[in-house]
């Protein structure tokens, strides 16, 4: 708002100066300035709730929200009441439409907890219109975090978000960009290329963005690459998104992020093979970055668990193994400093990752379960509550397990003079205890463990289902289904 105010104040000063100097301003330019004021202070609101209509998908996820609306774009629709409910169909000749869904060359998607700067669309659509960008399907600015976070966990989670912003910028160079999902400008023609038509009962559903996983934007990025489309990260901070303020809501978000990558990586390998047969090989840089993006949570979580649990001795823990990790931590500390954080925050992020270890492992195991059972899981939205969101007992218990186990290893290795592993175990115990205190809270963790234990002992009593009362057939039932009594009488006793 302040940027817009400065812009308008500058325009006012320029107009006053032209009057003082008695200079002529073109009438068309004056008209443009008036139109700009009208557009700034005029807003039109309209909403569309897909579940009000029986002709749209019933799936409860963000992907189907987008698919339902995009599938209706460019159509003039009529509301029609049927026995299944209200449906939307295309208008027929000489009918007046109830809805006119305008078509567009571009689609802007935005999460509910995200905000865009005022020149977001202006800059990104301008880039899409430049010569040579005809095959760019998605352009985005991976969101940044809001400054001045009031809690420690929100600040560290924001630091990891800002580092991801920089990582995504580098992925564009290797044509390995992933659609992040919180915001993007998408070319409608690219969505039409990846559209899949299916049926849900009696409904015909157009799926542009696959909902097989809860990270639907990642899978759509792979689909677009197969059809020769490219994705671009615009190198500016034009979007901002809220970070979960407490550990309970962060668990929901990070567990969702950890789920789905292993399912999509198989599809990526199939597309790599298909592109090879077409003579359009995937370059090594793109291949490595995409595989790392989809599978890094899985292998880093299992690797960290192995490092915490395995009893190393002096023969395995050589100085070269320790030095191999220094470039990673040096680069991360440099990125943190560039984003306005402290270099020492790498230790806080390390503790943050240990606290979230069980969350990431559960998301990874859920992906494996989905792959084995070929099922979908519901989209879990990040809670937005005034008070603290309670955490499942498992996720607040495991940091205590890590602390106790690390202390035991430190005690045992100290007496056996295994100094390398003793130092590592002691460091893990200290960092994890600090992270538990700062990010969860000792009292809050005890509360959540007690509540989880009580819930484990008590099973909620299900209310008995009442027998369905047969209602009198309406005129719609008679027209669409005929005599229901014949059906009841023909059933065996």
Give residue ranges: language-model regions:
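Multipass alpha-helical transmembrane domains of eukaryotic endomembrane proteins
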Residues: 11-34, 365-395
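Nucleotide-sugar-dependent glycosyltransferase catalytic core
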Residues: 244-259, 345-346, 372-386
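Loop-to-transmembrane boundary segments
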Residues: 275-298, 371, 377-408, 469-493
